[in-house]
A protein has these predicted regions:
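Rossmann-fold dinucleotide-binding core
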Residues: 99-157
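A generic "binding-loop/recognition-motif" signal
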Residues: 34, 69, 142
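NAD(P)+-binding Rossmann beta1-loop-alpha1 motif at the extreme N-terminus of oxidoreductases
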Residues: 1-58, 62-65, 91, 97, ...
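Short amphipathic alpha-helical segments
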Residues: 18-20, 42-43, 75-78, 105-109, ...
Length: 157
């Protein structure tokens, strides 16, 4: 099953994670604050580059974020060009950031209000785990969207 996926945040963890999703046959669009890094990723993995998180999320079935902290997460989700502005109804948003429980609850409520699902999915395994596609993912959220997202999450875990 090939899906339309967006991945926001191409740091030492996100870059290879998004790569594994692409290698599994999914159509991946990436966004990174440093556009040159996104362009490098797109060339390496044959993906697409978006100018904003909002553009990346548009029409995606699954939206992933892997950013630095709560403030970065708020910016890419709820900010002026955040993904919550364009995430389509029925899509599933998976956050791999190690963030606070408060922001996870906030994003869950906001996603529900906009008609899409949210999974809080922090990761463990470090850069080596990300590069090897063997991360441990601890997912919190509703079971039905988890079951739908699990095959995509499995690409990097």
């Amino acid at each position: 099953m090939s899906c339309k996926v967006s991945f926001i945040g191409l740091g030492v963890m996100g870059y290879p994670m998004a790569g594994y999703i692409s290698k599994a046959g999914h159509n991946v669009t990436v966004y990174n604050r440093t556009k040159a890094k996104a362009e490098k990723w797109a060339k390496e993995y044959k993906g697409n580059v978006a100018d904003t998180p909002m553009d990346a999320a548009k029409d995606s079935d699954f939206i992933f974020t892997c950013v630095g902290n709560d403030n970065d997460l708020r910016e890419v989700t709820l900010g002026d060009k955040g993904l919550f502005k364009t995430a389509k109804k029925g899509s599933i948003y998976i956050d791999n950031t190690t963030a606070s429980a408060n922001i996870a609850r906030e994003l869950y409520k906001e996603a529900k209000a906009k008609g899409f699902d949210f999974l809080d999915a922090p990761i463990s395994g470090g850069q080596a785990g990300a590069e090897g596609g063997i991360l441990t993912v601890m997912v919190g959220g509703d079971e039905a969207p988890f079951k739908k997202a699990e095959p995509v999450i499995d690409c990097y875990s």
